[in-house]
């Protein structure tokens, strides 16, 4: 009864939670990957925006922006051409989940990926991003050719 009352007066509210596919993911160069991301418990509009960034192993503290559902100028220069060419994109699925697609995976795509949902909530409460690791592997045929 007390919880219902507190909820009615706005004291108790849903807590935003962003979740991604658990990693690490292991993929070979040239493959197509998809990484799932979802937000729940948001107080804003039913359709949320998503932004994907990567933290590269060579500079793990530096965020490199990849793609966004709300800002076409979001990607850093190293990703702009692939985003505009449709090689990297976000697919919305029913409801709030989205899929980050990277076609023709490159060695430089390995790193820690972060899915972020900009706040649409009245109060900043909960998790607004989640991270996972992608480990790139060379194709076996490429490795064998170099050894020969």
List the model feature ranges, each with a label.
Residues 1-25:
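N-terminal Sec-dependent signal peptide, specifically the hydrophobic helical h-region
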Residues 23-26, 72-110, 119-121:
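Extracellular beta-strand/loop-rich beta-sandwich domains predominantly from IgSF
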Residues 42-84:
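N-terminal V-set
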């Amino acid at each position: 009864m007390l919880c219902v009352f507190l909820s009615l007066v706005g004291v108790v509210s849903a807590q935003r939670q962003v979740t991604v596919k658990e990693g690490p993911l292991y993929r070979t160069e040239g493959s197509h990957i998809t990484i799932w991301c979802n937000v729940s418990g948001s107080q804003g509009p039913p359709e949320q925006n998503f932004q994907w960034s990567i933290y590269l192993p060579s500079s793990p503290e530096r965020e490199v922006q990849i793609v966004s559902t709300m800002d076409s100028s979001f990607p850093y220069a190293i990703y702009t051409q692939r985003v505009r060419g449709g090689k990297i994109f976000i697919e919305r699925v029913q409801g709030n989940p989205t899929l980050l697609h990277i076609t023709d995976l490159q060695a430089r795509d390995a790193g820690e990926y972060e899915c972020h949902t900009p706040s649409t909530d009245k109060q900043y409460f909960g998790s607004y991003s989640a991270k996972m690791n992608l480990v790139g592997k060379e194709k076996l045929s490429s490795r064998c050719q170099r050894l020969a």
